[in-house]
Amino acid sequence: MSSDWQKLRDEDGLWRLCPAQPELAFEGEALPMIRRYCGDMRGKRACVIGSGDNYAAFALAGMEAHVTSIDISARQLEIARVRADELRLQISFVQSDADSLHLVEDNSIDLVCSTNGFFVWIAEPGAVFKQVYRVLKPGGFYIFYDVHPFQRPWKDQAAPLEMAKPYSETGPFEQVEAGQVSFEFNWRLSDLLNPLLDSGLVIRRLAETQAKARFWQDFSYEPSGDERLLDWHNNPRSGLPAWLTVAAQKPE
């Protein structure tokens, strides 16, 4: 997690509200898809991979699911553990790569989910999808939302619309922050959906939706923002979908 992102998460304090207001934890059509395909989450087993700020984990725990939160970052998990204790949420925190899920049993999970910012850190999406397929119960769902791949090629500015790179250029891209080097990926739709299908999962629903105005300003989940940025005449990128949401099922 970048220092800017961490600062915003600390300032907005929305993690305290997620258990009672799960809509704060999900963008795109993720929460409606969870409700449509998974129904009442009480007593069901949910696994959040690449859990990051753990908003989704807190929300699912508030929905009375038995939640396992998995992330590669020990620091992220420790922050989330302290917050979960404060909120009196029962969540299992596991440090693991998303492409191994080594402590999660086969055929044991009703819902796997991942949220915004997950796939930029994933070098082999197909390896992740195979693990998701393995841990899901037959009939279980993997539901994810992330920034739509169509947003990745552009420079981070409202106007003029300028490309920063070709859509086909997926990385790895080197990032350096506070002396730490990391690598990110900008996967295309085909890079995500083809290996998802190859894993054996079946896509039941796909949504490509717009974002709130705040999306075009900063990383905050807070409401409000400059509504003019939702007009593609002022901000051409807003004419493209901002979020990709997918619901995929492991066959019965």
Model-derived regions, located:
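Conserved class I S-adenosyl-L-methionine
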Residues: M1-R42, Y55-A59, Q76, F141-P172
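Class I SAM-dependent methyltransferase SAM/SAH-binding core
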Residues: R45-S100
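A short acidic, Gly/Pro-enriched loop at the edge of an enzyme's catalytic core
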Residues: D99, L103-L111
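A short SAM/SAH-binding and catalytic strip from SAM-dependent methyltransferases
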Residues: D110-P125
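A short glycine-rich, Lys/Arg-flanked "PGG" loop and its adjoining helix->strand segment in the class I
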Residues: G126-F141
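Short alpha-helix
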Residues: S182-L206
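Core SAM-dependent methyltransferase catalytic element
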Residues: S199-L201, E222-L229, N234-E252
